[in-house]
């Protein structure tokens, strides 16, 4: 009679699919070529009646040696395999399963005929996995193929077997001792052959399919009479069987698709959506949408740099809300809000981080509430909010102790972040963060709104590697570089329409989006915050890198502009930066109390005088012309 064999079962740990999804997103992308993997069969402490089972986990994508190092010594056999992961479910369904199995089995036959299987007998257990990963729904369709090579052997005798099992799953027995199977070349095919096999099946009278492949290899080599010592962990079920080949084999029939638990041929489905923590699902989903950009459109996009960027949002209103949401969409994980206001009833419809409930009881603090609501959107974001007033140039000090604390806290926040967004209502509120950003070599992105216009710009940054006298060369200007007067109080004695941000609702969305996109583009440039203005589409992997973007809704036009820094700027000139570094709060306090101080420090006063003299000379020359 012929020996009986039992099919192998696959047990795939969820970590295998997590690793597969990572590889698909980051490495494989659209590549559908086969990738090597490894699995292992336990052969120790098998339960009675247990069928052979191959196990895979996240380490299955590493080398066989690394996988073996994670297992107890002498407890499992490592086998090599391959996984073919296709891009669509339709391809998974339409792929010819016969061709796939034949190709996988052909590799085993090739290893037999070129004698590679003698050097590495584990090739006889080579397996293949055909899969599709639905990364949006976290569903993984997969089907294992265990190529089984058929040959016809009949058992001529059978009996119990004693003694210890060899260390190797496949051995040649010579002089009663196991030796490497590679020595089979020295055994004539007409001689009786004695081999040993360590079985991974605990089913009585049914052996692992790998024994069938072993016997088929011997048949291909021309052996007709074989004695096999089949060792099992339960020594009482170990057997010695003598077999005789019934017909020669050259191109054996191949079978081996795994059956379902119902005994039917068909793939399995692993639904990890119900197993993974919802916060981790959200984290992976954000990364999924971003990493898909790298598959075809922007392969060299540096997402890790964007993700690691720490962003400080000064202003948590309309612009701050939209900037925060856009940063989340780009995968930024550290976002800090600063504001001194509370949520009012007019805010939620224009500021998407607030709800009606945030307006009750006098209104919740804007900064803290914005941070809390960001966490409701994405729990793993590191969002914080701080209520503080930014000291404003031209606004006299009213409470020095509190304002000094706000100054110190703002300085700490600027130092601890990479990008500073200026999103406040008033012009003078932006002065101190502009100075601090330059002092700390930070990327500063400024967004300002008009009724139907907007300005988005990145500030030029003083490069510490350049000498002071070289700082004027090619450095881009800041928000204040077009001013010939130092910032002063622009909020006092305003009517209601001047105090509120009166703008077409869509303007804020446009400006906020452009501000975040400008930041992302800057981060892709090798010079980052020191990058020059460029209108060339090849400047970064995302295209051009402008200095300023000015948009107008009345004619739906946007201009890309550039302006060098102003030598006498009240916010970014070398004299202001040096004075801030040397005097700190005392310098700021003097600027708050006396706007003329900044003009005197920077040389704007002299500019005014020269302008007046030029105007006077022009008037005199005109007057003299009247008497000619």
Curated annotation (Swiss-Prot):
Name of the protein in its database record: Ubiquitin-like modifier-activating enzyme ATG7
Swiss-Prot/TrEMBL domain comment: The GxGxxG motif is important for the function, possibly through binding with ATP.
One Pfam family cited in the UniProt record for this chain: ThiF
UniProt motif GXGXXG motif: location: 315-320
Keywords from the UniProt entry: Autophagy, Cytoplasm, Protein transport, Transport, Ubl conjugation pathway
PANTHER family recorded: UBIQUITIN-ACTIVATING ENZYME E1, UBIQUITIN-LIKE MODIFIER-ACTIVATING ENZYME ATG7
A GO term from the CC aspect: phagophore assembly site
UniProt KW Glycoprotein keyword: no
Function: E1-like activating enzyme involved in the 2 ubiquitin-like systems required for cytoplasm to vacuole transport (Cvt) and autophagy. Activates ATG12 for its conjugation with ATG5 and ATG8 for its conjugation with phosphatidylethanolamine. Both systems are needed for the ATG8 association to Cvt vesicles and autophagosomes membranes. Autophagy is essential for maintenance of amino acid levels and protein synthesis under nitrogen starvation.
Protein transport recorded as keyword: yes
SUPFAM superfamilies, A to Z: Activating enzymes of the ubiquitin-like proteins
An MF annotation (GO) of this entry: Atg12 activating enzyme activity
Catalytic site positions: 500
Gene Ontology BP terms: autophagosome assembly; autophagy of mitochondrion; cellular response to nitrogen starvation; piecemeal microautophagy of the nucleus; protein modification by small protein conjugation; protein transport
Principal place of residence: cytoplasm
UniProt subunit comment: Homodimer.
